[in-house]
From Swiss-Prot:
It comes from Brevibacillus brevis (strain 47 / JCM 6285 / NBRC 100599). GO terms for cellular component: ribonucleoprotein complex; ribosome. PROSITE patterns: RIBOSOMAL_S8. PANTHER family: 40S RIBOSOMAL PROTEIN S15A (PTHR11758). Belongs to the universal ribosomal protein uS8 family. Keywords: Ribonucleoprotein, Ribosomal protein, RNA-binding, rRNA-binding. One of the primary rRNA binding proteins, it binds directly to 16S rRNA central domain where it helps coordinate assembly of the platform of the 30S subunit. GO terms for biological process: translation. InterPro entries: Ribosomal_uS8, Ribosomal_uS8_CS, Ribosomal_uS8_sf. This is Small ribosomal subunit protein uS8. One of its GO terms (molecular function) is rRNA binding. Part of the 30S ribosomal subunit. Contacts proteins S5 and S12.
């Protein structure tokens, strides 16, 4: 079966595993998914992400993070730019998520980065997802 939106599939797998408090989730790998996992780790939304080589494209193993009392660190994930409706932001229109409490993941000409990094670098791009 052909997957039309692999980034949405990644976010849905993380969201579903987070809702049932799984320790880890495995996602088919791609370059952009590795970059998204790197950003989630840097921003403290996940504990770790590792790439596991297999005979095909590889797997990204994402270890989810929970707070004291087993409360979720990730409260929401939302795909913004979709294959049917791409969403772009200019360098002066980069969105803030929940007034800066969340994070927007943006694909720019210089790579995949957070909304804060895009504002500092004065670059715009495709708004892939919001996470809070």
């Amino acid at each position: 079966m052909v997957m039309t939106d692999p980034i949405a599939d990644m976010l849905t797998r993380i969201r579903n595993a987070n809702m049932v408090r799984h320790e880890k989730v495995e996602i088919p790998a791609s370059t952009i998914k590795k970059e998204i996992a790197r950003i989630l780790k840097e921003e403290g939304f996940i504990r770790d992400a590792e790439f596991v080589e297999d005979n095909k494209q590889g797997i990204i193993r994402v270890f989810l993070k929970y707070g004291a009392g087993n409360e979720r660190v990730i409260t929401g994930l939302k795909r913004i730019s979709k294959p049917g409706l791409r969403v772009y932001a200019k360098n002066n229109e980069v969105p803030k998520v929940l007034g800066g409490l969340g994070c927007a993941i943006i694909s720019t000409s210089t790579g995949v980065m957070t909304d804060k990094q895009a504002r500092q670098a004065h670059v715009g791009g495709e708004v892939l997802a919001y996470i809070w």
